[in-house]
Swiss-Prot record:
InterPro entries: UPF0756_TM (IPR007382)
Protein name from the UniProt record: UPF0756 membrane protein lmo1568
Membrane-crossing residue ranges in chain numbering: 6-26, 54-74, 80-100, 117-137
UniProt-annotated location(s): Cell membrane
Any Pfam family the entry gives: DUF441
């Protein structure tokens, strides 16, 4: 029962409880339950491979709700381009989307960086009350940094 992976998960659960981070607590609890109920490795692989996309879909739905309810309309979109903050927001959205795309690919080909990114994200969630969207964006930043290193060589 107390394998290395279970101890690792319990450590993250403890960190989540200390930080009072419900997202981390729920995520770790779900994974622990999957392990305890001996959920098939195939299911775990599917969740690992598709989970980020499912999460992005849920976030996208949440972002679109104000449009569906009429809280945000075309006037708001047009007005957003009348301010520096609107243009900066547009640029930041584009940059983060590109970084996330590169990050997902990089995480798939370099498992070593994935471990560091996940640990860094958990630390940020616990210590700085960050949000666990970090690994994909961090991987994109790491990808761009590695491209720069390769270019310099």
């Amino acid at each position: 029962m107390f394998t290395e992976s279970m101890l690792f998960l319990l450590l993250f659960l403890l960190l989540g409880l200390i930080a009072k981070n419900n997202s981390l607590i729920i995520a770790v609890a779900v994974v622990i339950l999957l392990k305890l109920f001996h959920v098939d490795g195939k299911v775990m692989e599917i969740i690992q491979a598709k989970g980020i996309n499912w999460g992005v879909t849920i976030i996208t739905v949440a972002i679109l709700i104000p449009i569906a309810t009429g809280q945000i309309g075309f006037k708001d979109l047009i007005d957003s381009f009348k301010s520096a903050a609107g243009w900066i927001g547009l640029g930041a959205g584009i940059a983060v989307s590109i970084l996330a795309k590169k990050g997902v690919g990089y995480m798939a080909v370099d498992p070593q960086v994935t471990v560091s990114l996940v640990f860094g994200t958990i630390l940020a969630v616990v210590l700085f009350r960050g949000i666990a969207a970090g690994p994909v964006i961090a991987a994109g930043i790491a990808y761009m940094a590695m491209q720069l290193v390769a270019f310099i060589k």
